[in-house]
Amino acid sequence: ELVQNNPSVPPEYLIGPHIGQSTNRKHKVLSKKFLDFCLDSDILDMVEGILGENIILWSSGVFCKPAKLGRVVPWHQDGQYWPIRPLAVCSVWIAIDDALPENGCMRFIPGSHTGSHLYQHVAINEHNSVLNQGVKPSEFDKSKAVDNVLFAGQLSIHDVYLIHGSNANTSGRRRAGYVMRYMPGTSVYDREMPVGQSSDLAQSDFSERPIWLARGVDC
């Protein structure tokens, strides 16, 4: 329904459904359902084990790769794009559909998050790329990539420094997922960074986005 009601927005990058940002503002019930997922106690229990007891929800998004049409997500680190200081974020990625190699599941470089280091990113000017920056190829070993295979209803959690990406969906099956972004109460959401470094078709305005204290206190 979210994709159908937003034909002008790339389905790979529907940001903010929990606040209605990706909708035409009429779908209050739809937004509430997404927010309920973000504030689910079982989800927050898992996040607490990583970030601690004070948890802030700052973003969510639906990433839908249509059959035969889904675009490439280049190798990147989320920390390159996000207005969180210090960078301490975990992403909870829930599979709506089965996410398999043939329909463009997420791929990642194991251990690339250790050391909390942002690698050099370079510009990408390709029409089939979701992002306009990616990690410089010489910065990592692509041959070590692992497919993050998930079946519908399963989830994975990854770090803000993890190098990851995904291939285009060349199969006849859609690949959709819902991702929720959390930061600890000790981090600051920097509204001075107004626009995320996504592709021209999917700019993210960070300056006025609402955030939620999901659990604990704001430190």
Regions found by a protein language model. Name each.
Residues 1-75, 80-84, 121, 193-195, ...:
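Non-heme Fe(II)-dependent double-stranded beta-helix
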